[in-house]
């Protein structure tokens, strides 16, 4: 350390001598004081530098050699270092050292370590810049030399990817042969003389619009001709027509060209086609000929001669395989199975029911009064119009006289009418149908009817036969029913009705749902009296004479005439003597009033208790509501079909108003329901039905299945009853579905 100090002091001394020699006049007292201060405050160097380890090692080696070498060598080294410092100070690039006038003095000033580190960083940065500038200036100089040397030479610009300049070899143009077929369609048309329309019709088979357009263009003109220019004025084309005289001339020419025939020739042709009987009248009467042709087309085929009948009968009897069949009309007319249980009710004679023939086997009846005469014929031809296509004997009007039946009743072993010839030469025997239908009944010989306590009545009792529930088209017109009963197992009539009912399945036959509410919109078709007296009366079929004898208070005077439901039913003179009357039943309330008059004390007690219960019912209802929890009240709202409410008070008010409205609308159902709400959803449905019945225009739309907007239906119901606003929308939809009302969601 001391050695280094000594070396540095020696360096300063040498520098001072040099400065004094060069510029002695510039020194003053202040510079000397600063120099003295620098000497006094000089700190020994701690060898902190930013240079590499090699530099530090070299400095140490130099210091060691300096100790061994003489002083002269140290002086020379100091001189070289001084020259280097002078060059650095004179270099304009170095900006890290401040210019205080003397560069050597600045190095001797004591500086803080932090400032010194920053200065070292700046010095290192300048050194690096100098090293980099060496390359910078050399690169610029080389570029400058190149530009100067190559200034007169212009570089060629070439694309990165060169395109191939290979030219495609073009084929030499050759003339086309005119014999080559360009279009096969034109070739076929020209060679085979087919029209353009026919060829296109073949190609465009099935495309009617294109075909019609093609035909239209063909009809308008030849396609070979150039199309005519359209008339700018839009005038329609005019055509020449024949006048009346020209038409007459054309008719004469046509008549002269074609041969004429006389009326006798036409009559011969008609005789050959239709026979001699049909051509007896002349053809001048056009109406008679048309009527004759119409009647001839409607008449059944003629019967064969009487000589052929025995041969036909023998052939029928000799046939071994007889096919038993019935036509559809015969099946519909057959009441032998359905009416088996009602034969005892139908009025008929015992000897008439024993006959097995359809028309010939009927035994003669005794004429009584003006009811049945000897010359009265029983026309049953209308009953067997359905047999005319199969039975060759059904074509003749089957008029059976009562007097002739006695004469022809000797041979009743075989019936010719029941034989039907099949197209395959097979025959069969028809089943007997309804023997009692064409039998006239006399008033004197009428057997007693099944009577009731009221008098001589005939009730429409439900049928208990296995075919019950099947629609009978001969007895009533076709109409949709609510359900069809299909028996799974046919049992005998001797067994009980309960066993048969257990084996029946209900199949819905219409769009009405299987769950039918208590009320339906069909009740609106009834009168008010019928609505009020639905359960208090019974409708029966009675003789008008017996109805007059009954009490007029019990029987209504609006009688209904008995009409045949089927158009093919035969009307008899006894139909006017029967009528259908509504007889009022005994009211149970009147009986209870009579009993109450007998026991006045008990009746008074009952009245008092009922009045007390009716008075206390709203309070009890409110107490029951308040005692229930919110969960139970909300559940009751959901089951009944009302809108959900938030608070308990609103729920109770909604249930109270609903119970009051429904109790006034249906007073008979009061107190039937238990639990929180004393009404059900079905009662709400009934109330909505009553509200909608007040609008006939709305009912007409419902009956015609017109889609009705839901909001319009709700507004209609709300106008009649504001309580509808508290009913849930899903409840209204369910009610509409049950009643068959078509709804839609749009608000149009």
UniProtKB/Swiss-Prot annotation:
Described purpose of this protein according to its UniProt entry: Regulatory subunit that interacts with and increases the activity of different structure-specific endonucleases. Has several distinct roles in protecting genome stability by resolving diverse forms of deleterious DNA structures. Component of the SLX1-SLX4 structure-specific endonuclease that resolves DNA secondary structures generated during DNA repair and recombination. Has endonuclease activity towards branched DNA substrates, introducing single-strand cuts in duplex DNA close to junctions with ss-DNA. Has a preference for simple Y, 5'-flap and replication fork-like structures.
High-level lineage: Eukaryota, Fungi, Dikarya, Ascomycota, Saccharomycotina
Protein name: Structure-specific endonuclease subunit SLX4
Organism: Saccharomyces cerevisiae (strain YJM789)
Residues with the Phosphothreonine modification: 72, 113, 319
Domain of life: Eukaryota
One GO BP annotation of this record: DNA recombination
Alphabetized UniProt keyword annotations: Cytoplasm, DNA damage, DNA recombination, DNA repair, Nucleus, Phosphoprotein
Bias (Low complexity) ranges: 277-291
Subunit: Forms a heterodimer with SLX1. Interacts with RAD1; catalytic subunit of the RAD1-RAD10 endonuclease. Interacts with RTT107.
